[in-house]
């Protein structure tokens, strides 16, 4: 049995900790929603061939558009395919780095396990 006043170890101090944890969770949830909206609106540019091919994606890697210069078209199908692939990879890398950076900003200082 527990001594007087010890109860189940869930006193006022623990209630404050629990309330603070819920508050932090709500802040993260609100921040994540705002972040998702920001990421959807972003336009991140990936390029290849010195700008001959440009791929624009959102901050959450959704393709928005592809721009191909006439000079790239003149290079032939195989090279054009390589340029488009390289530009897509460039855009993807930049977009995921941006997403990761924004997530770190969102969770910094919250003392969340695993972040």
Curated annotation (Swiss-Prot):
The record ties this protein, via InterPro entries, to: YbaB-like_sf (IPR036894), YbaB/EbfC (IPR004401)
Keywords on record: Cytoplasm, DNA-binding
Is Ribosomal protein there in the keyword field?
no
Which Pfam family, an example, fits this chain? YbaB_DNA_bd
Q: Which GO terms describe its molecular function?
A: DNA binding
Main location class: cytoplasm
An annotated GO cellular component of this protein is:
cytosol
Q: What does this protein do?
A: Binds to DNA and alters its conformation. May be involved in regulation of gene expression, nucleoid organization and DNA protection.
For this chain, the family text in UniProt reads: Belongs to the YbaB/EbfC family.
Q: Subunit info? A: Homodimer.
UniProt protein name: Nucleoid-associated protein Ava_2322
Protein source organism: Trichormus variabilis (strain ATCC 29413 / PCC 7937) (Anabaena variabilis)
């Amino acid at each position: 049995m527990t001594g007087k006043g010890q109860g189940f170890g869930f006193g006022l101090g623990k209630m404050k900790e629990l309330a603070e944890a819920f508050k932090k969770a709500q802040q993260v949830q609100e921040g994540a929603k705002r972040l998702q909206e920001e990421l959807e609106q972003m336009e991140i540019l990936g390029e290849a061939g010195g700008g001959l091919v440009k791929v624009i994606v959102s901050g959450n890697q959704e393709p928005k558009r592809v721009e191909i210069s006439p000079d790239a078209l003149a290079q032939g199908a195989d090279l054009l395919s390589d340029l488009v692939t390289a530009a897509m990879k460039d855009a993807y890398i930049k977009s995921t780095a941006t997403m990761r950076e924004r997530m770190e900003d969102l969770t910094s200082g919250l003392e969340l396990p695993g972040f």
